[in-house]
């Protein structure tokens, strides 16, 4: 599966602290190697407009969201857990 990131994702990514960005890079590498790794908690969290929404853990307090597509995942959001909760509810 391919993983791509939307422009908004990159803007949010660059607004994160250097420590969180480094962890996001590590988790993304892990995701590409083994999407079932327990530290990722990679899972479907909902559906909007007929598209599956998937989540991956970045840190204890940060998550990333993607839309599942035929050819892989489009990552559209990364941020803190509080904002994540409001996005998926």
Give names to the regions the model predicted.
Residues 2-7, 11, 15, 51, ...:
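Enriched for short, Lys/Arg-rich terminal
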Residues 30-56:
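A short, surface-exposed loop/turn module that caps and links secondary-structure elements
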